[in-house]
Amino acid sequence: LARSSVESFLQFSSRRDLREKAFQAWIRRGENGGTTDNRTLIAEMVALRGERAKLLGFATFADYRLDDQMAKTPAAARELLDEVWGRARAKAAGERDALQALVAQEGGNFALAPHDWRYYTEKLRKAKYDLDEAEIKPYFQLEKMIEAAFETAGRLFGLSFKPVSMPLYHPDARAWEVLDAQGRHIALFIGDYFARSSKHSGAWMTSLRDQEKLSGDIRPIVLNVCNFSKPAAGEPALLSFDDARTLFHEFGHALHGMLSNVTYPLLSGTAVPSDFVELPSQLYEHWLEVPETLQRYARHFRSGEPMPKALLDRLLATRTFNQGFDTVEYTACALVDLDLHSLPDASGLDISDFERKDLERMAMPAEIVMRHRLPHFQHLFSGGGYAAGYYSYMWSEVLDADAFAAFEETGNAFDPAMAKRLRDYVYSAGNLRDPSEAYKSFRGRLPTVDALLKKRGLADVTSA
């Protein structure tokens, strides 16, 4: 089950029984008994993490994990999440009421359930903005979105991308040589965009070789992996707007690795605190939504015509639509993660019981399910890079919203002076300096939460 295919089914299937069946299969991964049930293993991992933290002199694993992060303490991370959580719940309640009204309007005699949310949200979006995913997708060809990501990097950082024919690990993977403005080799970039059975779900960036100067001028080899639906032979790959955003997000990570300019490999590229590492990726998403980018690259796959301005305007008007749901879905995961790894004693832990009680304590809306439930929460338990650190996406979003506002304040989304500071202090700097100092060097001050609340449509919402 891949998220992109399951969510598309939940959006468009009119069969409520099949939506429920698909949704239950999706959210119950890892807790169905047998050899694929992860709950006992996860409980053991959480307990061992707590033991390790105590051996190192910390009260909990969360205290240990955040000690060298930008947030520094679990309390600081929770303060941000709590500020967003109340507003998100209030906004989601209004969204739920609108969807329930639509159910009643169509003669439905049932209470909105989690497997209904995306279906009726798509209907409401179409009614409210005269917009549906099927109308948008023909304008988002994978090839054009790759071009858009590359051209944005060219305008901001002077990079160009030259296709390279070389042996790779799978026929779907492609490679490009990355050159700077003077034509010098910067990196090798590999894109592997289509879903297949040998991949786990999601999208990610990884480095096959990091940039460093300790043993010579070593240039990086960087890989982006996605799970977009592969088209039939001879047909173009078409993306949802969310898929296109994912492509830009992962390419932001790739640029963080490719533009690295440090001496020591341990400080190279994305080797930064996890609550800072999402800044380059989430910030890069903003350039997809610059009207100039969409006008140039959002073109119909058959006619080649650009997206009509009226459709483009309606698309951009939806940016805060359903943000209550999106924010609740994410923030619940971040809060549960922090709470789980803040347990002073995790021995004898029942993962399902803990998740249920923690969500009840938080007053989680019944119509929304965590984006990643604990039994299949790969960020936390497949390597553990985000254990007690899933809050970092929201923390980084405070940074990215504030950082893009710096470009907007110049009146030019590609302002050269601002782009140079961004490259010097963020994309190329690795972990050379404390993230707070790096951000202040770029922005001239520390970030505020105001731009984030505005971006998510929460600025004028009163906490529930």
Predicted feature locations:
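Acidic/His-rich structured neighborhood in mature extracellular/periplasmic domains
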Residues: 222, 241, 256
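Noncatalytic, helix-rich "gating/capping" subdomain that lines the substrate-entry/channel surface
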Residues: 1-64, 148, 184, 359, ...
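Non-transmembrane, amphipathic alpha-helical segments
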Residues: 34-37, 80, 243, 388
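Active-site-proximal, well-structured secondary-structure segments within enzyme catalytic domains
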Residues: 1, 43, 48, 52-227, ...
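C-terminal, non-catalytic "cap/extension" segments appended to globular domains
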Residues: 127-129, 144, 148-162, 167-170, ...
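Short, histidine-centered active-site or binding-site loop motifs used for metal coordination
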Residues: 26, 227-230
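Short small-residue beta-strand/loop micro-motif enriched in glycine and branched aliphatics
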Residues: 8-9, 73-74, 231-236, 265
